[in-house]
């Protein structure tokens, strides 16, 4: 989905959910952005046991050991690069070392990234929120849930602001 639509926020809700926390032995969040850096990602997955070396094969071995036999959740947030060669180098040890039931959740704006990842589950495409949802969220954030529905002035101002935000939650969060 487009920027500001709520991909990262939704992924954070999943990542921080108590059932998700108890289901996975290891959870890792990596803000990827651009460029797609396999060494940075592998070191993030390795956590405290990350090597100081920047030699890719060695870093990938350390990453493999850190997840060996563990059910993990890896969130790769804001992936732009769709270079399948780089992804395959990182993906292979993740699949080989992690326990059955491990998951990789990816947020991206680009359909090419989804194709490159060869996802085994469906992509969830987020769209703009309806006017009603936007108004509800905006009022919650702007007025801390005080009763604003009875005030026509507040309602008109809220609607004018939301028209400019075009259904993007990040726009009215700012």
Annotate each language-model stretch with its function:
Residues 2:
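P-loop (Walker A) phosphate-binding loop of NTP-binding proteins
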Residues 22, 39-40, 88, 115, ...:
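Alpha-helical elements of the RecA-like P-loop NTPase motor core of helicases
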Residues 7-8, 77, 107, 168:
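Short, conserved phosphate/pyrophosphate- and ester-handling motifs at nucleotide-, phospho-/glycolipid
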Residues 16-23, 58-129:
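A conserved switch/coupling segment of P-loop NTPase cores
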Residues 45-54, 99-102, 106-174:
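Non-catalytic, charged helical/coil tracts that couple and regulate nucleotide-powered enzyme cores
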């Amino acid at each position: 989905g487009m920027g500001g639509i709520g991909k990262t926020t939704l992924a954070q809700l999943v990542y921080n959910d108590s059932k998700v926390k108890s289901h996975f032995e290891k959870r890792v969040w990596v803000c990827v952005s651009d460029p797609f850096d396999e060494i940075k990602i592998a070191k993030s997955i390795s956590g405290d046991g990350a090597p100081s070396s920047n030699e890719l094969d060695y870093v990938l071995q350390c990453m493999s050991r850190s997840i060996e036999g563990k059910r993990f959740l890896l969130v790769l947030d804001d992936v732009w690069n769709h270079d399948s060669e780089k992804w395959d180098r990182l993906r292979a040890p993740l699949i080989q070392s992690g326990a059955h039931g491990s998951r990789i959740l990816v947020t991206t704006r680009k359909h090419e990234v989804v194709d490159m990842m060869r996802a085994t589950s469906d992509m969830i495409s987020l769209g703009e929120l309806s006017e009603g949802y936007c108004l509800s969220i905006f009022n919650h954030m702007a007025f801390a849930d005080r009763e604003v529905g009875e005030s026509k002035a507040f309602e008109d101002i809220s609607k004018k602001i939301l028209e400019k935000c075009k259904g993007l939650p990040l726009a009215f969060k700012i």
